[in-house]
Design a protein with these regions (language model features):
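Gly/Ser/Thr-rich phosphate-binding loop
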Residues: 277-281, 290-358, 461
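Conserved AMP-binding A3 loop
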Residues: 65-70, 192-218
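Conserved AMP-binding/adenylation subdomain of ANL enzymes
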Residues: 217-232, 239-300
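Conserved AMP-binding/adenylate-forming core of the ANL superfamily
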Residues: 50-87, 94-100, 104-108, 125-130, ...
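AMP-binding/adenylate-forming catalytic core of the ANL superfamily
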Residues: 141, 390, 395-396, 418-502
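Conserved ATP/PPi-binding loop(s) of AMP-dependent carboxylate-activating enzymes
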Residues: 366-370, 379-406, 426, 441-445
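Conserved structural elements of the adenylate-forming
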Residues: 73-81, 208-230, 236
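Conserved pre-ATP/AMP-binding loop-to-beta segment of ANL
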Residues: 49-52, 174-198, 205, 227-232
């Protein structure tokens, strides 16, 4: 069911009203140091108390629920109060579950408290989740139900479930009303570790990035340029990924509204109901949106995406120019941004000109003001490894000095990405240092450069360039099979090969029947 209006505010019967809580929340704000998420979230909450912060489909009542900014801040205070009463102050809390409002509430409460929160991928096996809980030394874990991980014994870890949210809020509200909350008045410091994110890049070993409060506030000006209080966005990223966490926080810097998507199976219905003005995607999701538009007139295509969509922001590998042109045909701007978990997700940003998203062709956006990006050992074209310094740079990997030293040197992140900057501080990513192929001829080839060329061929949805027997080869997925499709691709390949140096030419092209394997964040896996 997707009704025309939101029908109820979540857990509104479990907490005091915002007007009643205002004085308490003003007192709480005085305990948050300035460069903390809590300071900016509560400041914005008091500025827009009646505006919807999040909306979502409530499966229990089969309607659309919402939470206002004022209601959200009140519930954070209530949940934080009860968690502190239970001894959770200073503890590490892991979250396992699909995108839901209770997940969001627990996450934001931890972020606005003296706690460390660890989002985990709910699609992982119990064995893998157990390994990660031990690896990050979690003190407690919150899961979708009491039955989750029921067969797993992890000594010393407390368990809570999102189904207990209402009970916890009522208990916390009683503490606030009686002025017995230890959460009220407890400081949140800029330098404290508040978030730990598991990351393995595109195939490396498991690592846990430690992020401070001040790391997470660096992007606030970017979000305020990108979104305004009239915008409504659709959250598609998984919340175990730094891009999802960024979108979740970005809402609270801006006064805008974010709809928590139930997943791709509901995407068409959600687009029709939510009518988003902006959507944040990874490349695979951008491809899916194009599939939705396929064959439609401009008017019909825009209607299928809700009718109000003005822009799409891609937080992943750079998109081919052909994709940008196809979205532009429907009056939709699409830009790419660059970031990594170790920099809280954001290094570059999209520009907004006259209300429209804009970026230079081929770039992954303009470097965010206050972040220093330089190119190490650039070649004659200015191409080299991308290095990053700034307030957004992480503290290191949890209990992993070796991996920390490999990437973080004197406060500078050595990203392993190869790219260049132009005179306007726009960044262009060419490829990954570790992906560079050394051919039998001794020549170096960056596979991502050739993949960008392959994506210019019509109907190429996915591709992977790799080295085989000392030469360049490629796998291509178009969704079409047969001799005719192979011949079409080979004709296009011959044209491409004539335009590039001999050592870069693709000697073998394989048309594959299934999409390429991907990581949990949507990146194509390289062997």
């Amino acid at each position: 069911m997707m009704p025309d209006t939101c029908l109820h505010e979540a857990f509104s019967d479990s907490c005091m009203g915002y007007a009643e809580a205002t004085k308490l929340l003003e007192r709480a704000c005085g305990c948050f140091e300035r460069e903390t998420s809590a300071h900016y979230f509560f400041e914005n909450g008091m500025r827009h108390p009646g505006r919807h912060a999040y909306e979502w489909h409530d499966p229990e009542q089969d309607n659309v629920a919402y939470i206002t900014y004022g209601g959200l801040m009140t519930q954070i205070a209530a949940l934080g109060s009860e968690l502190y009463r239970q001894g959770c102050r200073g503890k590490t809390m892991a979250l396992i579950g699909k995108t839901s409002y209770p997940w969001v509430l627990f996450f934001l409460t931890a972020l606005c408290s003296d706690m460390v929160v660890v989002p985990l991928d709910s699609s992982l096996s119990d064995e893998e989740l157990t390994k990660r809980l031990r690896h990050c030394r979690a003190d407690m874990v919150v899961t979708e139900s009491k039955e989750s991980l029921a067969d797993v014994e992890i000594q010393g870890i407390r368990r809570l479930s999102f189904t207990e949210t209402r009970r916890l809020l009522k208990a916390g509200n009683d503490l606030l009303a009686a002025h017995e909350s230890d959460w009220m008045g407890t400081p949140v410091r800029e330098k404290q570790i508040c978030l730990m994110m598991f990351t393995s890049g595109t195939g490396g070993r498991m690592k846990v990035a430690m992020l401070r409060q001040e790391n997470l506030t660096m992007e606030r000006y970017v979000w305020r340029d990108l979104l305004n209080s009239k915008d409504k966005s659709l959250l598609l990223y998984p919340l175990s990924h730094i891009a999802g966490i960024g979108h979740l926080r970005g809402t609270l810097f801006t006064g805008s509204t974010t709809y928590l998507s139930a997943g791709f199976r509901e995407l068409l219905r959600e687009l029709a109901y939510v009518k988003p003005t902006i959507v944040f995607v990874v490349p695979a999701q951008a491809t899916l949106l194009l599939e939705i538009l396929k064959g439609d007139s401009v008017e019909e295509g825009r209607r299928r995406l809700g009718g109000n969509l003005r822009g799409i922001v891609n937080k992943g590998a750079p998109l081919p120019e052909s994709m940008r042109e196809r979205f532009s045909h429907y009056g939709i701007d699409i830009t790419s941004e660059y970031g990594l978990t170790e920099c809280c997700g954001g290094v570059t940003c999209s520009c907004v000109r006259n209300g429209r998203l804009w970026s230079k062709t081929g770039s992954v956006g303009m470097v965010i003001e206050g972040i220093n990006v330089r190119i190490e050992l650039p070649d004659e074209q200015g191409v080299g490894e991308v290095l990053i310094r700034g307030q957004n740079v992480f503290d290191g990997y949890f209990e992993d000095e070796t991996e920390t030293k490999a990437i973080l040197k004197d406060g500078v992140i050595h990203t392993g990405d190869i790219g260049y900057l132009d005179e306007d501080r726009f960044l262009y990513i060419v490829g990954r240092k570790k992906n560079v192929m050394v051919l039998s001829s001794g020549e170096n080839v960056i596979p991502e450069e050739l993949e960008a060329e392959l994506y210019q061929i019509p109907n190429v949805k996915e591709c992977l360039v790799y080295e085989k027997d000392g030469a360049v080869a490629a796998k291509v997925f178009t969704g079409v099979l047969g001799a005719g499709e192979e011949e079409r691709l080979n004709i296009a390949l011959r044209s491409l090969n004539r335009s590039i140096p001999g050592y870069k030419r693709i000697q073998k092209l394989e048309l594959i029947s299934e999409p390429l394997p991907k990581t949990s964040s949507g990146k194509i896996v390289r062997n």
